Amino acid sequence: MTVLIHVLGSDIPHHNHTVLRFFNDTLAATSEHAREFMVAGEDNGFTESCPALSLRFYGSKKALAQAVIAKAKANRRQRFFFHGQFNTSLWLALLSGGIKPAQFYWHIWGADLYEVSNGLKFRLFYPLRRIAQGRVGCVFATRGDLSYFARQHPNVRGELLYFPTRMDPSLNAMAKECQRAGKLTILVGNSGDRSNQHIAALRAVYQQFGDTVNVVVPMGYPANNQAYIDEVRQAGLALFSAENLQILSEKMEFDAYLALLRQCDLGYFIFARQQGIGTLCLLIQADIPCVLNRDNPFWQDMAEQHLPVLFTTDDLNEQVVREAQRQLASVDKSGITFFSPNYLQPWHNALRIAAGEAE
């Protein structure tokens, strides 16, 4: 029997760390198909912190792709589980036959599915990637992303799967201890990545609420982002008074980030695609409603779980926000499909499907 190989095809430290830690702590002990990884980027202590996994690191995305293609050609029974897919060479290999459809299983992370960049090289590459995506053996994704993908590729198998957000189920009831009143605090974006469209989001918040709310913008990740942080701060101070705007430029530890989220009354996410599920989950767990772009298909997942959804096009005010908080507080968090531990069983199913052990 050939053991499934997992591929992290791009050097995205935060996401890769979450995936590796999840597999090491939760999946590796019960499945031999949850232990082999090929990772783009440096070790950064992963080998030491994930002793249950067999990890191979590659200095570049291209080097990793070449190694994957060589393995795929050497043994056509070898299957790969691609987590996210930000690696041009791997898509081209699927397109050209270097990797066969029966070898290629893909967990969509959102950004790797949507065509949002206006850069020339991306606009030229997107049509090729779209064709390649139609050759995937099976995709795993959120309900909204599965729906989006199926419109383009109705013949490709799709299975529900959620990114393994680090969550403590015991905190599901913690929000009940918080009494929310006074000036609203609004979280804008889930990181410092430009995909959050921070400046447009700040303007949208100002248009809805004026300079009457506290605005918190977490921008400690990714690193080396000071120029963009300064740009966002300047735009924010043109709208909000200094005491109402908090730009967080330092990377935060998980517990500190969790404490920050629980001080908020509303999350505001203007991006028109699925991203930031981890932050959304932690906000929902704390009974903090989220404002989404109507083009972000994750609203379908939220509606399926009977969670209130606010949209950027809605008329928002404190009364609307407090009512959404009340509705969230009435939801039994233990039944939400994309919360821990409920997302675990779909992961076990995904491993069996990708390994060829389940229909």
Curated annotation (Swiss-Prot):
Which GO BP terms, alphabetically? enterobacterial common antigen biosynthetic process; fucosylation
UniProt xrefs under Pfam families: Glyco_transf_56 (PF07429)
| EC number annotated for this UniProt entry | 2.4.1.325
Name the chemical reaction catalysed here: beta-D-ManNAcA-(1->4)-alpha-D-GlcNAc-di-trans,octa-cis-undecaprenyl diphosphate + dTDP-4-acetamido-4,6-dideoxy-alpha-D-galactose = alpha-D-FucNAc4-(1->4)-beta-D-ManNAcA-(1->4)-D-GlcNAc-undecaprenyl diphosphate + dTDP + H(+)
Entry superkingdom: Bacteria
> GO cellular component terms?
plasma membrane
Where found, per UniProt?
A: Cell inner membrane
According to UniProt, this protein's pathway is: Bacterial outer membrane biogenesis; enterobacterial common antigen biosynthesis
Task: Give GO terms: molecular function aspect only.
Answer: 4-acetamido-4,6-dideoxy-D-galactose transferase activity; fucosyltransferase activity
The membrane-topology field of this record reads: Peripheral membrane protein
| InterPro entries on file | WecF
Record's keyword terms, sorted:
Cell inner membrane, Cell membrane, Glycosyltransferase, Membrane, Transferase
Q: Which HAMAP family match?
A: WecF_RffT
Family per similarity comment: Belongs to the glycosyltransferase 56 family.
Task performed by this protein: Catalyzes the synthesis of Und-PP-GlcNAc-ManNAcA-Fuc4NAc (Lipid III), the third lipid-linked intermediate involved in ECA synthesis.
What this protein is called in its record is TDP-N-acetylfucosamine:lipid II N-acetylfucosaminyltransferase
Source organism per UniProt? Salmonella dublin (strain CT_02021853)
This protein's gene is called: wecF
